[in-house]
């Protein structure tokens, strides 16, 4: 087995790249037809998502103003408000960034924006995923332990605050690992291509593998697992209540009204989990495939590659339709 390069060799290689290395002009990436279609669809979904989420936010604000003066927003609507804000953040950062980057192909915004926008991109991806977890946990507690949740009214606010904090902290490494590299023409003198990448930010290959796995787990695996567990608990509780003796069920309805008023909770949380799974699975399947087999991009057709990535942009479009239908 061949020995891996020493840290000194890696450092020299990275220094050569940062000082501009020769690159054949024919090897430079270009905006293909499928790339143009991706850009068009991306900006269409951007307008759609921005309209849906902003409209729901305004509708929620108008609904709040109609309430009695000084009355606080209900816990569920507070959670939906933060999920809408998180989706709006993802819409306003990730979609335009992806669209413009596909148009320009290379990075023209400089080192500072390379780091800052990479941080904001991941932050705005963490936030909706964590808010979905908060809503799933809250709805599960509302069904399985309603009295305990009602006695502690600050649980929802605490989980929301924690979700925003974790999103900010977990995205922090982006400020360090992303950097500019410059590639030169065959003479090695004139810079012909610049890109914002993580190249040479990790001293060992497994450091990057660990970071990729951590990010993948926090963005997809862990939120999906928690949502599935919460949905399973809700289904189990509602099924048990619905199969009670009719006389006993009538008595229970006067206490918690689970069968009628909270049945839509199950439908909404299942719809959230389904939307999350359907929209993000193709994106992460492609990412994992590339992680284990970088050459797959040479075998996978360009249209299929772009199509898989576009799936992720559907999630912030679907969410306002789901919680708008079930909550208002």
UniProtKB/Swiss-Prot annotation:
Principal location: membrane
Associated clinical condition: Hypogonadotropic hypogonadism 7 with or without anosmia: A disorder characterized by absent or incomplete sexual maturation by the age of 18 years, in conjunction with low levels of circulating gonadotropins and testosterone and no other abnormalities of the hypothalamic-pituitary axis. In some cases, it is associated with non-reproductive phenotypes, such as anosmia, cleft palate, and sensorineural hearing loss. Anosmia or hyposmia is related to the absence or hypoplasia of the olfactory bulbs and tracts.
SUPFAM superfamilies attached to this UniProt entry: Family A G protein-coupled receptor-like
Tissue: Pituitary, ovary, testis, breast and prostate but not in liver and spleen.
Keyword Membrane: yes
Annotated keywords: Cell membrane, Disease variant, Disulfide bond, G-protein coupled receptor, Glycoprotein, Hypogonadotropic hypogonadism, Membrane, Receptor, Transducer, Transmembrane, Transmembrane helix
Outcome, altering residue 83 to V: In HH7; the patient also carries a mutation in FGFR1
Molecular functions per Gene Ontology: gonadotropin-releasing hormone receptor activity
Gene Ontology CC: membrane; plasma membrane
UniProt GO BP: cellular response to hormone stimulus; G protein-coupled receptor signaling pathway; gonadotropin secretion
Consequence recorded when altering residue 10 to K: In HH7; is able to bind GnRH but with a reduced affinity in vitro
Superkingdom as given in the UniProt entry: Eukaryota
Cytoplasmic-side positions: 59-77, 138-164, 233-281, 327-328
Outcome when changing residue 266 to R: In HH7; uncertain significance
SS bond list: 114-196
Glycosylation sites per record: 18, 102
Upper lineage: Eukaryota, Metazoa, Chordata, Craniata, Vertebrata
Membrane spanning residue stretches: 39-58, 78-97, 116-137, 165-184, 213-232, 282-300, 307-326
Name of the protein in its database record: Gonadotropin-releasing hormone receptor
Keyword Transmembrane among UniProt keywords: yes
